Amino acid sequence: METATLIAIFISCLIVSFTGYALYTAFGQPSKELRDPFEEHED
């Protein structure tokens, strides 16, 4: 394969994996450990 194709595939995989990790952190199991600053400072 050409170098440009490999670089494009590599960057695409990086973007997809980062997006998947961000969604897992936001909505998956680790989301229970996230704190909500708006709930901590109710008036």
Swiss-Prot record:
One of its GO terms (cellular component) is chloroplast thylakoid membrane. The chain crosses the membrane at residues 7-27. InterPro entries: PSII_PsbN. It comes from the Eukaryota. It is found in: Plastid, Chloroplast thylakoid membrane. It is a single-pass membrane protein. Keywords: Chloroplast, Membrane, Plastid, Thylakoid, Transmembrane, Transmembrane helix. GO terms for biological process: photosynthesis. Its main location: plastid. May play a role in photosystem I and II biogenesis. Belongs to the PsbN family. This is Protein PsbN. It comes from Psilotum nudum (Whisk fern). The lineage of its organism: Eukaryota, Viridiplantae, Streptophyta, Embryophyta, Tracheophyta. The gene is psbN.
